[in-house]
Amino acid sequence: VKVLVTGASGLVGTELIAQLRANGDHAIALVRRAAKNENELAYVPGGTAEQNVALDAAMKTAGAVVNLAGATTGKLPWTKAYKRELIESRLGVTQTLVDSMKRVGAATVFVSGSASGFYGDTGDANLHEDAPRGSGFLADLASQWESIALGAPKSVRTVLIRTTMVCSRTKGALGRLLPLL
């Protein structure tokens, strides 16, 4: 199966690409720079159809699209400029993928990232996926992100994954802290 993946250089994306390839799937990382090999495809998030001809061509034959794009929420402080980056790195990419699906036909499955921040600060409450949206910057961002993803063609099974902080023994914040313990 051909799988297009955004956010392929992130913690989850790196592992997903490796697992897909180990399973014999054709995983293609969508990148915002020039592609380095046949396993990468350059695209322009927020770009026009003319700027994304290669994306449209790949989308026509993709079995699945996995959208993990987004600047890390672990970087502090969240200045106005960084909040803008958090927004643009998610919403623009997602809209570009949905627009491509609408133009050329779509993959069978669209898995799009979101965040547990959708629920806001609920204290110690136990939450289920049907819990109402919370309030605050992350809740607003996650809600907008999901809304765009749900604009994919109705023929596409759209799955939203609300992840929280992802930990790894070798990467990210935990990877940097473990050697100190």
Name every feature range the model reports, one short phrase each:
Residues 25-32:
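Conserved glycine-rich Rossmann-like NAD(P)H-binding loop of the short-chain dehydrogenase/reductase
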Residues 15, 19, 100, 148:
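Rossmann-fold NAD(P)-dependent oxidoreductase module
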Residues 153, 157-160, 164-181:
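NAD(P)-dependent short-chain dehydrogenase/reductase
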Residues 6, 30, 68-69, 110-116, ...:
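SDR active-site strand-loop-helix element
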Residues 3-23:
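N-terminal Rossmann NAD(P)H-binding glycine-rich loop of SDR-like oxidoreductase domains
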Residues 134-159:
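Active-site Tyr-X1-5-Lys
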Residues 83-85, 94-136:
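Conserved Rossmann-fold NAD(P)-dependent oxidoreductase catalytic core, especially the SDR/UDP-sugar
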Residues 35-96:
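NAD(P)H-binding glycine-rich loop region in Rossmannoid oxidoreductase-like domains
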